[in-house]
């Protein structure tokens, strides 16, 4: 098996077929809806909150609300009252089952539910998928996180409508350091490996450092890319604002950090400061333009045309050209 990550790969251009990148369609369909970009901000407390999720939904972007210190039932009710879709996160503990029961009791059906735990290839996830499919069959269920083909096969067979691939490759995740496990350092290979057996959409989660990594993720099988650090640090971001030597930063920490949990127990995340980088809307526009450019370099007009390109690996024993692998 060939091992590489985002910084080891470059995609090879094909003849351009458009006059302007604005002719390229960067949209993607997930479930019953289409979204402007194959990108979703990470469901983390320092990345998204209720106002950001509402704005994303109103402007044609996908979102997943985090599951920490949140009344999911109230959130779903509010989003539907405002005429937009509801996309929530659940764990696999009793309070999460109680949330499902409350949603059913109130006749609320979230359009998207993400089962969001650190090690998603687990019987506990199997049980929650089954419960959701029984109680809320109208919800599109995303399950993760995972990092192997075996996990993709199992989660799909258990009923997941999409899987989320990535074990600890994120900027504020230290899973590989704390446990010795994960996809950190080879996330793009793991994505390629998992996509080979997937029959349903994959969301690549973590390891994205530059906008070009979005195109690389799509090339190797992702339908959607979850990003934390590039979305943290905006003026609207919920993280606490910190001033250091006259410069403004936003706090950004992992979901399994002690900062998020409020206690030092089973910690697999850390806290960093992200320089404030302006408005979220401006970043999303720039991302869309960059993805459109990627499509034009791929010789296409639609997002999935990126999957048709060849690529090269940079450096190491595996260096060389790879044709449509």
UniProtKB/Swiss-Prot annotation:
Keyword NADP annotated: yes
Keyword NADP among UniProt keywords: yes
InterPro entries: Aldolase_TIM, GMP_reductase, GuaC_type_2, IMP_DH/GMP_Rdtase_CS, IMP_DH_GMPRt
Annotated residues for binding of NADP(+): 202-225
A cellular-component GO term for this protein: GMP reductase complex
Catalytic activity: IMP + NH4(+) + NADP(+) = GMP + NADPH + 2 H(+)
GO biological process, one term: purine nucleotide metabolic process
Enzyme Commission number(s): 1.7.1.7
Keyword terms of this UniProt record: NADP, Oxidoreductase
A GO MF label: GMP reductase activity
A Pfam family this chain is assigned to: IMPDH
Enzyme class: oxidoreductase
Catalytic residues identified in the record: 173
PANTHER family referenced in this protein's UniProt entry, alphabetically: GMP REDUCTASE
Protein function: Catalyzes the irreversible NADPH-dependent deamination of GMP to IMP. It functions in the conversion of nucleobase, nucleoside and nucleotide derivatives of G to A nucleotides, and in maintaining the intracellular balance of A and G nucleotides.
Family: Belongs to the IMPDH/GMPR family. GuaC type 2 subfamily.
Name of the featured protein: GMP reductase
Organismal lineage: Bacteria, Pseudomonadati, Pseudomonadota, Betaproteobacteria, Burkholderiales
């Amino acid at each position: 098996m060939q091992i590489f990550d985002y910084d080891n790969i470059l995609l090879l251009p094909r003849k351009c077929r458009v006059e302007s990148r604005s002719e390229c369609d960067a949209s993607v369909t997930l479930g019953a809806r289409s979204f402007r970009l194959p990108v979703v901000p990470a469901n983390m407390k320092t990345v998204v909150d209720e106002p950001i999720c509402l704005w994303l939904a109103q402007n044609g972007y996908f979102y997943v609300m985090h599951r920490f210190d949140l009344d999911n039932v109230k959130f779903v009710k509010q989003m539907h009252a405002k005429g937009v879709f509801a996309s929530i996160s659940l764990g696999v503990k009793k309070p999460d089952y109680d949330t499902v029961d409350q949603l059913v009791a109130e006749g609320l059906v979230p359009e998207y539910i993400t089962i969001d735990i650190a090690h998603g290839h687990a019987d506990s996830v199997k049980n929650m998928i089954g419960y959701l499919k029984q109680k809320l069959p109208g919800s599109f269920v995303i399950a993760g996180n995972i990092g192997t083909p075996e996990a993709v096969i199992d989660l799909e067979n258990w009923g997941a409508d999409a899987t989320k691939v990535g074990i600890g490759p994120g900027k504020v995740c230290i899973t590989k350091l704390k446990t010795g496990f994960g996809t950190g350092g080879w996330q793009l290979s793991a994505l390629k490996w998992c996509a080979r057996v997937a029959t349903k959409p994959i969301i690549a989660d973590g390891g994205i450092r530059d906008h070009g990594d979005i195109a690389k993720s799509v090339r190797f099988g992702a339908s959607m890319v979850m990003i934390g650090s590039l979305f943290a640090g905006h003026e609207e971001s919920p993280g606490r604002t910190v001033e250091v030597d006259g410069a403004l930063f936003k706090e950004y920490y992992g979901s399994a950090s002690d900062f998020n949990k409020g206690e030092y127990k089973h910690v697999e995340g850390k806290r960093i400061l992200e320089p404030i980088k302006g408005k979220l809307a401006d970043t999303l526009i720039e991302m869309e333009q960059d993805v459109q450019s990627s499509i034009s370099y791929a010789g296409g007009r639609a997002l999935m045309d990126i999957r048709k390109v060849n690529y090269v690996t940079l450096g190491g024993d595996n260096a060389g050209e790879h044709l449509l692998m």
